[in-house]
Amino acid sequence: MSVMNAHQRQQLENTHDYMEHLKREHPLRDLFWECTLRCNMSCRHCGSDCLKESRVPDMPLADFLPVLDEVAAHCDPSQVMVETVGGEPLVRPDLMDCGRAIRERGFMWGMVTNGLKLDHAVARELAQAGITSLSIDVDGMREEHNWLRNSTTSFDAAMRAIEAVQTIPDLTWDVITCVNGRNLPRLNEIKNLLIEAGVTQWRCFSIDPMGRAALDKSLLLTDEQFRDLLNFIVTTRCEGKIDISYACDGFLGAYEGLVRDYFFYCQAGLTVASVRANGDISGCLSIRSDYSQGNIYRDSFWDVWENRFEQFRDREWMRHGPCKDCEAFRYCQGDGFHLRDGNGDLMMTCHYKQLKNIKL
């Protein structure tokens, strides 16, 4: 699959026009709060290199609430999802208080969890705290999942979490799988496992060379393996038994429109902002701290959102190196911002060129 058809090209043009609109208007839709850097696992692929105890303390809820009050003063909070992420959010003892405070201000509240602490009792607490969105990590069958997570109990905990979240009323939830060379051959088994467990939404990620994953290149997919992942997603979408998609990770050329419900554009700084555990304000949390735009302890969050983020909203500066003469730059705009190192260079071959490298 190497050539885009006329319909795809028209949709890419439409997406390009929409991106230009977002650059001008930048309506905030997703606000990620790194509520802790502590974690109860030590996963091989962790992009944040999280530990059981962190040198950076959890941000007090009282420090984050003024950010929400600022946002609510300038836009409709019911249209903004506040995602509590980590680390592992459930290691934070006041997480339910955080969730209630978010909901009391009219925002939607979501969370990404490894599931280790999520049982039926915790699910009831989450429901009472008003959670609206949740993602659970399942990274393979038992052997592959436990290997990636460095834990002998994490697979059973994740499956228990899947059972528990189905008791939460009106919850939007999905399963996230980080695909690597070990679990790629078992994607069909994983698919059947998830369907049998009641999962209807499934997002697949490939692993990027960040955090601990930067030290273990075996976690990264080869060009051919990456193509196989995308082909699996296309086939599974056609089957219609589970709603599967590839993550918002990068521009995919001829696979655009086939593996996601939308055409790629990096939303960091356009509709997505983040507050790190130390107060830094950025686009998405996967982006290096070099690109932080301010800090809530010295800056107004809303002023930063409205008047900074130039690097995010005008990405012509990314048009160098392999992007300089690339025919896809108009549409990919330098690919996912998180793939840039501190010098602005790509940390890996972009997905578009990965797919082009394959000899058909």
Predicted segments, located by residue:
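Radical SAM enzyme [4Fe-4S]-AdoMet core and its adjacent flexible, acidic
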Residues: 1, 52-55, 59, 128-129, ...
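Flexible mid-to-C-terminal extensions adjoining Fe-S/redox cofactors in radical SAM and related proteins
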Residues: 2-27, 286-360
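Conserved alpha-helical substructure of the radical SAM core
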Residues: 2-133
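Residue-level preference for beta-strand/loop junctions
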Residues: 27, 37, 171, 266-267, ...
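Exposed loop/turn and edge beta-strand positions of beta-sandwich/beta-sheet ligand-binding modules
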Residues: 29, 80, 269, 278, ...
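Residues immediately within or flanking Cys/His clusters that coordinate Zn2+
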Residues: 32, 36, 40, 263, ...
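Structural motif corresponding to alpha-helix initiation and N-cap regions
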Residues: 61, 92, 119-120, 184-188, ...
